[in-house]
Amino acid sequence: MKTVHFIRHGETEQNAQKVWQGHTDTPLNKKGIEQAKLLSERISSRGTNVYTSDLKRASQTASFLSSSPVLRDNLREINVGDFTGMSVKDTYTSNHEIFQSLQNDSFQFPNGESVKEFKDRVRKELEYIFNQTEEDSETVVVTHGFFIGTAIGLTLGFNTYPFPIGDITNTSISTIVKRETVTQVNKFNDSIHLSKESIDFPAKSKDNVITFIRHGQTDSNLEGIWQGHIDNPLNETGIKEASLLKGLFKNYNLYISSPYKRANQTLSLITENNIEISDELTEMNLGQWEGLTTSEILNKYQKNFIEALFINHKTKYGIDGESIHEAGKRVENLISDLEKKKLLMASHGGTIKSAITNLIKSPDSKAASAFTIPNNLGVSCLVPKDNKYFLWSYNVGKIGYENISYNK
């Protein structure tokens, strides 16, 4: 597996003023420099290869991660042409018809880049970066918000703007992994190096937020066993790590947990609020995979394993278990009865992956493989708007892919 971490540059004065920068060569402001320092403490050891856009705000951020980052102009932000230096809000308001045209690949920013040119540039650069990344190694790429959003959207299977994702935070980490020909989103918009409070940052500013947290570690997780409906409790590590999150999740209307011990125990450790139980949040029914390691599953059910996890989201896990599509629909049914509320829900890796895939309407061609399973205690946030769900973060927390047996 190859891993690439995409990082948005630190803040600039233009970011603070909310104006379009495009290809303008702007430096970091004081806050941006502090953000880059905090980022370096978290990720500087993650990869020997660091690539960066050649624009100053990105290369300056990259300089905190490597003494010799590789500069690439193909990693630049989209060229917004005549909009450069203009207020983002004002241009959206006065050019509504123009931005509606972003759905068309032939649209071109006035004296700037076309949608098709930019998407092609992002695709080619993704291919280049992964080709330069060795198997079982990590690469760090410092680039820009629109570039990262496009890379994530394309990986999730979308092709037409606007993609169902939220605003990307300065110095946030978004990770894409590649197994042979399959690319998956492992992490999106993670900036907890700036503040622990940002673990569920959309909940701090949005009226309606759906936040998922995967349960803490169990012995089965540690041993690489697919536990599904087996009702395991947290192990010592799971209890310790969940306890560290106490008090961070505030101002939710409802706290809901799967009935299984590992999920309910996790939510009880991070909040003192009343917890409701919902069977709709149980882990996926793994059918004949239940209680087996990945190696054992591959020995007995290799074709079913590959098809269910990477090819067809309607294929049942373990022959007679549950599909990604079915698990996602049951969570959607739960949420539809709880509209206009802030929800914090403790659930399981397969169910969270399935729910988010379904809620953002990942295209069928990528619905099985859009996301990796989130890590233990990984936090993901969705924001509903205009009868749609927008992904604002995924698998916020630890960097790297914990599911070692699954990875092998």
Give the ranges of each region predicted by the language model.
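Active-site-proximal alpha-helix that buttresses catalytic centers in soluble enzyme cores
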Residues: 2, 7-71, 113-115, 119, ...
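Acidic, low-complexity terminal tails and accessory targeting/binding regions
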Residues: 2, 72, 78-90, 131, ...
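Short active-site segment of divalent metal-dependent hydrolases/proteases
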Residues: 12, 147-148, 218, 351-352
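Extended, hydrophobic interaction surfaces within ordered domains
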Residues: 22, 30, 34-37, 41, ...
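Active-site signature of alpha/beta-hydrolase-fold catalytic machinery across serine-
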Residues: 64, 150-154, 269, 354-358
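Phosphate-handling substructures
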Residues: 65-124, 187-189, 233, 270-330, ...
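A short, acidic, amphipathic alpha-helical segment used as a generic capping/interface helix at domain edges
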Residues: 126-130, 330-336
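A conserved hydrophobic position in a structured secondary element of the catalytic/binding core
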Residues: 143, 213, 346-347
